[in-house]
Amino acid sequence: MSLLSKFKNDPLFAKVMRSSGSLFSNNTLALGLSVVQGIMATRLLGPAGFGLIGVVMAFASTVNSIFSFRMSELVVRYGGEYLNKQDKEQASALFKAASTTEAAVSLLAFLVVLFTAQFAEIYLAKTPDIAWMFTFFAINLLANFNIETSTGVLQITEKIKLQGAVNLIQAIVTTLIIAGAFFFGGSIIVILVAYLIGRSILGLGLFILAQNQLKEKLGSGWWRTPLSKLTARKEIFRFAFSSNISATIIKLFRESELIWVGFFLDTTAVGYYRVAYTITHFLAIPADPLIATTFPEINKLAVEKAWGKLKSFLKKITAFSFAYNIAIGAGLILFGQWVIQIYSGKEYLAAYPALVALTIGLVFNYILFWNRPLLLALGLPEFPVYVTLAAGIIKLALSFWLVPVYGVAAAGGLLSFYYIASVGMMVLRGIVEIKRKEER
């Protein structure tokens, strides 16, 4: 049997590809619109203005992640198991706990942004009289009060493709507003409003879709189920706490790059880095649908203790992701300067060294995109915490020395180091654990 036949005849791989393909098609259209948004916003605002918007948006997201419990992972891990066992009572209690906790965290995050906006203005944006922007954009945290739980529900009910439809709608609305600002001389405020409306549409849209799925699967009164019906409260709390710590570490060391660049340099440098970061994250477009659709399948195989099938599945999705990530990565490195000029103009060519550095680490990360979901499915939620913390501390320590001297290229290189070190260790740990369980 040929390699291609093995892929085509694997029903699990085919199922994941179908679900990912549906989500990918909508996300591809949304990506095209986000490119158009970037083309207009970079030219309208210039590097400093584009960087300022990036810092404002990243600050709200980072504060939220510090308190976030990554409810989508908890919902997939335990909600998926309960639904598979037709244990609707425990599933209802879990979804209720996840929803209320996430809503409380979103409110807390908004209040933290409100009280720290002045600090962000002085030390991160380094631009006078813009503290209100941080508070204004943080309204999206309230609109996204249940986005993680909703995403998890759509994953385990196999309706994740609907996320792509909502994402496309918000991309269309955001693009139309930015286009109006671009052609009619709008200000940075209009751009900020556009992104706020887009984020709000995504959060509220997913919430409505998830509620419909919960009513269909559990009945209209699912939310009345008392939390006391959860029997594995200690285990669930351990998972949620570990996910919270892991999410905080990941956000501080990996996904808050614009904030750190703003802290070490200025908003112009943030503008350059944001362009490089945005372009290289085109790699995430095919990867994100795969992550969303493979985690539930990995979790199912782990629950069933089907270790042979799990290894075969991981090999297939890794081979698939290797092929397209290497191709896209090589294209970004070879034609990166040309891509930057098309996306944002010659004014942003200083972003190219950072683009090259970031591409290397992101290609490695997205080839092995299943690293953390595998450990969660294997019951090892703490291991990613230790690894990401160690790699993150080293990265941050080196940043104080290298970024002020070598600029955005050093920032990109250090993030790549973080990806390679942390992802590599998590993959090795997952493989070792599968072998250990097979030998039992």
Protein language model regions, located:
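Membrane-water interface segments that mark the loop-to-transmembrane alpha-helix transition
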Residues: S19-A30, S68-Q118, A306-G329
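Interfacial segments at transmembrane-helix termini and the short loops linking adjacent helices
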Residues: N9-V16, A117-F137, T267, G308, ...
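Interhelical loop/hinge segments that connect adjacent transmembrane helices in multipass membrane
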Residues: M1-V16, I188-L192, L206-R254, E297, ...
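Helix-loop junctions and terminal segments of transmembrane helices
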Residues: F69-K85, Q155-I156, G219, A276, ...
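Interfacial/gating helices of multi-pass transporter permease domains
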Residues: A41-T62, A131, I189-V193, T231-S243, ...
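Hydrophobic alpha-helical transmembrane segments
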Residues: A131, T135, A165-G221, A390-I394, ...
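Membrane-interface junctions at transmembrane-helix termini in multi-pass inner-membrane proteins
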Residues: L142-I169, I189, I360-V387
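Signature of the first transmembrane helix
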Residues: A14-R77, F110-A117, N140, R238-T268, ...
